[in-house]
Amino acid sequence: MASQATTLRGYNIRKRDNVFEPKSSENLNSLNQSEEEGHIGRWPPLGYEAVSAEQKSAVQLRESQAGASISNNMNFKANDKSFSTSTAGRMSPDTNSLHHILPKNQVKNNGQTMDANCNNNVSNDANVPVCKNCLTSTTPLWRRDEHGAMLCNACGLFLKLHGKPRPISLKTDVIKSRNRKSNTNHAHNLDNFRNQTLIAELKGDCNIESSGRKANRVTSEDKKKKSSQLLMGTSSTAKISKKPKTESKERSDSHLSATKLEVLMSGDCSRPNLKPKLPKQDTAIYQEKLLTFPSYTDVKEYSNSAHQSAFIKERSQFNAASFPLNASHSVTSKTGADSPQLPHLSMLLGSLSSTSISNNGSEIVSNCNNGIASTAATLAPTSSRTTDSNPSEVPNQIRSTMSSPDIISAKRNDPAPLSFHMASINDMLETRDRAISNVKTETTPPHFIPFLQSSKAPCISKANSQSISNSVSSSDVSGRKFENHPAKDLGDQLSTKLHKEEEIIKLKTRINELELVTDLYRRHINELDGKCRALEERLQRTVKQEGNKGG
């Protein structure tokens, strides 16, 4: 601090104006005296300045003689009359002593106010500045207009921005301050938010780990309980052990229903991972569902045990000439857990192979390796999506049911037009030839009754994988000759029906096309008639005008 005083000893320090003026020899002597009297090392704090009475009087004399315009914090000029040499005489002898550390803005002397630069003396009672426009005396900053009139901060800013005086209606006694948020507070809030998010994430990770540990503990406890239940073999423990299985089944059923909904909405029938499921129920109830709802595509799931296999008797006559049998048809369907995608209707006639007839006198069962398709689910009229399934993928024994012949006859008697897709019909015709050739090569003709459901809607139903076995009594088997079985007649009848349906479809499409063409011709003829009439009217008008001119 002493070094600062010695280096700045030859300058009058003005912190406000950043002006360093050289001192006289008297001022240097007075400064040396003050240092000798115990003020060595003292320095005015920040915002203050050291001012002596002699310096103030000398500066005032110089400024009054030069007539310079002096401005203070209030930004206004002071006249030379206000600055006089009498101010030095008015000061009390107390101020002529050592350097006093005074505030930066004012020096109070006997009821008067003097600013730090000694630029102006203003009385608190008489010379209070007043705004010329709004007549206010409270403002944080005084301004002046282009003529030198004193204005408050608000009026001065309004005049500077708008170029006209501020209206008095905008005058307010309350000075409003700007609400500015500091950057430090904003950064602090951001840091707090980040810390909170990190803490929440850490807590979530801890909760996940704890839940995983709990799940592992629960699974281990469940395993122990299951083992104890198996050892004890009580009914109560058996009930408890069935709960997780039912929950897993419900979850898998919900997942399968969602995937089926997606398949039906998108029209995509080539999902190999889609496994149809149904809850366990009686065969009669399921048969009634199939009879009432022919588009029911789900296949009933059964176990492979022989005790659960049952025969369902139903009357089914595809045609009086093609089905002379009076025996009841029983359906045995056994679906494995890994049943692949369901084949299309075109696989109905081309997959008849590898049949076996049991001669034990009680029943005759024919198993189809490739599966026989029955139509159930509807497809879009404009799309002919066929699902080609490999014969090896289809299980040997597939359980399904036959639809009611009453529904078939009702749908055939319906006057609504039949609109099949041409590509699928061609596929069926090709597979029909294959089926006939396969039947001819076999020594004993099988008792297959492939079922073709012709619907009135513009669709071809998707096939459920199935194998149909005909249970015939021993008396009927003994009195019947297999050589007289109408398997060949069945193929011929199917081919004739397919040809007829195809011709009907072609004729109806041709009729629709001709109707559209006739409608177009009619419109064109009407347009030509209108043009002819307009031309005739114009001709008549021109003839009349020429006749009037000639007459």
Curated annotation (Swiss-Prot):
Protein's recorded name: Protein GZF3
Main location class: nucleus
Keywords tagged on the record: DNA-binding, Metal-binding, Nucleus, Transcription, Transcription regulation, Zinc, Zinc-finger
Species in which this protein is naturally found: Saccharomyces cerevisiae (strain ATCC 204508 / S288c) (Baker's yeast)
Record's compositionally biased regions (Low complexity): 467-477
GO biological process, one term: negative regulation of transcription by RNA polymerase II
Any Pfam family hit: GATA
Chain intervals annotated as zinc finger (GATA-type): 131-155
Biased composition (Basic and acidic residues): 244-254, 478-490
Further remark: Present with 319 molecules/cell in log phase SD medium.
CDD domains from the UniProt entry: ZnF_GATA
Biased composition (Polar residues): 228-239, 388-400
GO molecular function, one term: DNA-binding transcription factor activity, RNA polymerase II-specific
Record gene name: GZF3
Start and end residues of each stretch annotated as Disordered: 17-43, 212-260, 379-400, 467-490
Annotated localization: Nucleus
GO cellular component: nucleus
Xref: InterPro entries: Transcription_factor_GATA, Znf_GATA, Znf_NHR/GATA
